[in-house]
């Protein structure tokens, strides 16, 4: 990947001037100027996903300049470098090949001259066999009973992705009950263990190194709980599986290495649900549906790699995001799925985006001080958010671009629930774009029989300025295939932005310092002696904790 400061490109400088030219033009005026705006500013994927980006503060010149920016930042070359297994994660000297995990075409993908696809396919075959045995009931626990509950123990990418997907695809779940434990707070594992029976529970310990503090602390507690009932360490093999690469530590734990599912250092944690880390997904929805999840992502990979920039959905979304955060001053993006099954979608991409692009050092090692990198990502399902934080989006002083996501078809046809849900989905983007003028507010009052003199003091509070940017993503139905495509779409959006930001999107050194300090503090919490080895605030907090515990 080349080292190109985006602010030094011709396109960036042109965009700065273009922003000034467009500053006084509202979204409403853009619609008036362009009668075919919806058709001209929307894209479809596989006739199952519609992305409408017409309600943004952009015109064709904006898009043209943004595409020029992508070209000047060598986006196409960077994309090919990723798909071809080059070590684009330079700070860790690793390839970035989550796309190989869902390479349904099975075309060779090389890392260091070796085709990785045979190993990928071998792990998938092993996962399929394991899933069939557990789901069918052939896999028995230590008392001869079939498995009824699966507990996934992981954190970060080993938890957020599998949990998000199993929740999103609950309509496809089988009889197995899934549980996810991530927090090192003992409450998380304790409350989970209250719900399950050691005779019929399977634990998946998801840790590449098998040394992750939070995961192994929870796994050891689960092991103790299990052995208190089983009274035989040899039975661990029937109730624990490992998603790891550390054979020695897995064996030491007592897990049969036949029940160890491998993945590779070219799989980043936040991109790992497509790997063995997705075993909990496959157990929950069946392996055929897991393959459909991979297939949807693979189709989006092909679209991203081959579609012209003008028709390329991930590139378009990424470029609009860069426009919003670097030229319009937005600092956050809200992800608002109008589907209760997608209630963890925003949390998943909060990690995906912020851990990838939350960087202040560019690819040359220089501090970035003249442009913004990754935005803050947040969100909740609609319509809940409407009764919580939409007030600020509509009438606050900050620009908050929003992605509204909804399925046209529901899995639960219940009275007119879905029409009411979707009426809100459509209404919100219309309200955010077009608002309500003073004249419209006054007209409403007059229609209600009020005089303008009576209401003049309340009118300003009921005005909506509009001109708030949104994308509308309408999915025909949330299926394993469309969910896979949606996830891959956002993954590639993040990649594109990282390329243009001139940062390394696939490391996460920002999580390390806190871990190091926690390891230093942990032994200090054991005794009762006063601590004075830190700053006065940290010393004071530790000592108060010791006196209160």
Swiss-Prot record:
Pathway membership, UniProt: Carbohydrate biosynthesis; gluconeogenesis; Carbohydrate degradation; glycolysis; D-glyceraldehyde 3-phosphate and glycerone phosphate from D-glucose: step 2/4
Coiled-coil residue spans: none
GO MF terms, alphabetically ordered: carbohydrate derivative binding; glucose-6-phosphate isomerase activity; monosaccharide binding
Keywords: Cytoplasm, Gluconeogenesis, Glycolysis, Isomerase
Name of a matching Pfam family: PGI
Catalytic reactions on record: alpha-D-glucose 6-phosphate = beta-D-fructose 6-phosphate
This protein's GO CC annotations: cytosol
Primary location: cytoplasm
GO terms for biological process, alphabetical: gluconeogenesis; glucose 6-phosphate metabolic process; glycolytic process
Active site: 355 (proton donor), 387, 515
EC number in record: 5.3.1.9
Location relative to the cell: Cytoplasm
InterPro entries registered for this protein in UniProt: G6P_Isomerase, G6P_Isomerase_C, Phosphoglucose_isomerase_CS, SIS_dom_sf, SIS_PGI_1, SIS_PGI_2
HAMAP family hit by this protein: G6P_isomerase
Family annotation (PANTHER family): GLUCOSE-6-PHOSPHATE ISOMERASE
Protein function: Catalyzes the reversible isomerization of glucose-6-phosphate to fructose-6-phosphate.
Similarity comment: Belongs to the GPI family.
The protein, known as: Glucose-6-phosphate isomerase
Species of the source: Histophilus somni (strain 2336)
